[in-house]
Structure formats: C-alpha cells, structure tokens
Design a protein with these regions (language model features):
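Bacterial N-terminal signal peptides that target proteins for export
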Residues: 1-9
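Hydrophobic helical h-region of N-terminal Sec-dependent signal peptides
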Residues: 10-18
Length: 271
C-alpha cells in the first residue's frame, strides 16, 4: 500500500505543483533520472489519448523550434515534441524534455520567435528541475492525502469553462486529467521568474530575437478574455512585472543572440 501511494504521488508531482516552499530534491529520495522515467510514461499516456494536430505547417514549426531550444539548453534529454489539437492557449514541458504545444496558442504567438520564447520558458522549468523540487516539497510536507484526494478529483475539469475543455481535461487519466491541469498553475513565483530569465537566454542562444519575448507577453495580455484568461499565464507573474523583468534582462540575452552562430530574427510568421 505504501509503495502504491508513493507511486501515485510521484505521478502527480511530475506535473502537479502543490506548494512553493523551498527544500532540496535530495530530501525526496528520488533522482532526476527516476522522475524523468515517470514523466516519459505519463507523456506516452498523453500521446495515446490526445488528439494530435494534423496541421503540417504548425507541426513542422513546433518540431524545428523545439529542437533548437533543446540544443540551446545543453541538456541531453530524450526530447519529444507534439502539437495537440486543442483550444487551450497553453504549452508545457515535462521533466526529461517531453514537450507539448496546443494549437490554441499558435494564433496568439504570431511569430516563430514568440514560440521560441514560450518553449524556452517551459524547457527552463524542466532544466532547472522545478518538477523534481516540487516533488521534494510535497513529500516533505506529507502530501500523500492530498495526492489521493487529487486523484479522486480527476475528470472534474476544475479549470474548464466549456464542455469541450472538460472532455480534453480527462485525456490521459492521471497525467493529462489532473496533473497537466495544474502543471502551469502551481510553480512558485520564484520558479516562474527563473524560467522567464533562463528561457529568454535559451531563445537567444537558439538564434531568435530575444526582444520578441517582451512583445509576446503584450499579445498574451491582449488575448485574455472571460473568466481567467489563457491557462498559460493564469497564475504567472503579472504582465507588467514580467515585461519589466524581461526588459531588464534583455542586454544579457542580446549578447547571447549576437554570439549565436545562426540568427533567425523573428522567424516565420504563424498563419
């Protein structure tokens, strides 16, 4: 029984960020390799249940930009990339480099460089081990009970406003139903800021104009509507704070961009 509870908690913690207090991954008694293995299993489940987009142009762009960001990160993960056909304005990267982008975010991005900014941010969460750290935090605070309660709430579609969204939220059982719903929502504010900074460097290193990261958040703010706005930014730092931080960090990112062997600027427009 104890083993089953630990396995359940681990599956949730891959993507469900439960708290923001600090602790060390070592305290969790789990290695980066172990959590990457569990993330890979969850990703396979997502792929088996989600509707993969048949938009060849967007799929090729996601693949291309993801590969460039992955290379810029310097991590030798077993990278995988998918484009999910869904209305969510969202993207995520599981531990170990398992990336998903939703078609709903593509029209908001407008440019290839903006996609690089989003992917840079999400990949940074993985490379900075934020998922592993949150597993450690949860274990330290004995969240077994909360994990079980969360599992029983799968399918509740807590963040969804439409029937289609509620249906999509159930995809992939534990990982896609409960975990992915909260993946973007429960990183600490400090984690989000760190991912913004590191992600801006990744996009610049990959050859994309880093100032587009600032314009991206202007467009994301403009895209908000109804209750809560896009999932991708719903609990992230405020738009003004985020743009201010990215502007402050821009000189360092511009230096990375100038040193990049390939410069794509804004890249292709997203149509």
């Amino acid at each position: 029984m104890k083993f089953q509870l630990k396995k359940l908690l681990l599956s949730l913690m891959i993507v469900a960020q439960l708290t923001s207090c600090a602790t060390s991954p070592e305290a969790a008694g789990i290695s980066e390799e172990e959590i990457n293995i569990e993330a890979a299993k969850a990703f396979q489940e997502v792929k088996s249940k989600a509707k993969i987009s048949n938009n060849k142009e967007w799929t090729a762009m996601v693949q291309k930009v993801s590969e460039r960001i992955a290379k810029a990160s310097g991590k030798n993960y077993q990278w995988e990339y998918i484009l999910i056909d869904g209305p969510e304005v969202n993207a995520w990267c599981m531990p170990g480099g398992k990336i998903a982008v939703y078609t709903g975010i593509m029209p908001v991005l407008k440019t290839e460089a903006a996609l690089a900014a989003v992917l840079g941010h999400e990949v940074a969460h993985a490379t900075l081990l934020h998922g592993l750290q949150n597993y450690a935090r949860a274990k330290q605070q004995n969240y077994y009970g909360l994990a079980i309660a969360g599992a029983s709430a799968i399918g509740g579609a807590l963040l969804c406003k439409t029937e289609k969204c509620r249906q999509l939220s159930q995809l992939g059982g534990l990982a896609a139903g409960f975990g992915l719903m909260f993946y973007q929502r429960k990183f600490s504010r400090s984690d989000e800021t760190d991912a913004d900074q590191e992600g801006q460097l990744y996009m610049a290193r990959a050859g994309y104009e880093p100032s587009e990261s600032i314009r991206l958040w202007e467009r994301m703010a403009a895209s908000k509507g109804g209750a809560g706005g896009p999932e991708f930014i719903s609990t992230h730092p405020s738009d003004d704070r985020r743009k201010g931080n990215l502007t402050q960090w821009l000189p360092a990112a511009q230096a990375e961009y100038q040193n990049s062997p390939n410069k794509y600027g804004l890249g292709a427009a997203i149509k």
